[in-house]
């Protein structure tokens, strides 16, 4: 909806935040833009991913049809203040921090981390994402890459 408002009000540039979960569940690392729509999505967040993909496609159409200057950013796994720090179902970094702090308080010598440790993930602090959004507003307009 904000993209339509941007078009109507002649906003110079607007930002659309995507998500790394738009890429196929078994996409090769490092993930590349061209992997979009090349395989099945992770089932647990499929609806969210499809909504984000629809948003990206809308942005592409507004860019091509109406010359609206839109930057689509695909942040990786974000962590930071006010995140989900639950030890059992929180986001990866905050959950690990909670487990480490709890183990330190209890003077434990080891902790149990979930998963196999095999997935490769990238993480970005929320404040760094904010800086990158501001920085992306300042870049000169470039042709949409496909």
Model regions and ranges:
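Hydrophobic positions on the long internal alpha-helix
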Residues: 1-6, 58-59, 132, 136
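Conserved Rossmann-fold NAD(P)-dependent oxidoreductase catalytic core, especially the SDR/UDP-sugar
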Residues: 1-45, 71
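A structural signal for short coil/turn segments at secondary-structure junctions
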Residues: 8-10, 66, 140
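Structural signature of the Rossmann-like NAD(P)-dependent dehydrogenase/reductase core
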Residues: 14-18, 71-77, 112-115, 122
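Active-site Tyr-X1-5-Lys
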Residues: 25-27, 34, 42-76, 95-107
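Glycine-rich, phosphate-binding/catalytic loops in enzymes
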Residues: 30-34, 89-91, 130
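Glycine-rich "substrate-gating" loop/helix at the edge of Rossmann-like oxidoreductase active sites
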Residues: 44-48, 76-91, 115-127
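Alpha-helical substrate-binding/gating segment
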Residues: 64, 78, 93-111, 121-146
């Amino acid at each position: 909806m904000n993209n339509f408002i941007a078009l109507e009000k002649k906003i110079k540039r607007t930002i659309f935040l995507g998500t790394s979960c738009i890429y196929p569940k078994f996409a090769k690392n490092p993930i590349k833009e061209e992997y979009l729509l090349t395989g099945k999505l992770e089932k647990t967040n499929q609806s969210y991913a499809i909504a984000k993909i629809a948003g990206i496609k809308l942005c592409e159409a507004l860019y091509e049809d109406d010359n609206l200057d839109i930057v689509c950013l695909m942040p990786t796994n974000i962590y930071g203040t006010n995140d989900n720090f639950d030890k059992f179902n929180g986001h990866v970094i905050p959950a690990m921090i909670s487990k480490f702090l709890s183990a330190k308080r209890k003077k434990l010598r080891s902790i149990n981390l979930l998963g196999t440790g095999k997935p490769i993930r990238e993480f970005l602090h929320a404040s760094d994402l904010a800086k990158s959004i501001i920085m992306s507003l300042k870049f000169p307009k470039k042709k949409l890459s496909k």
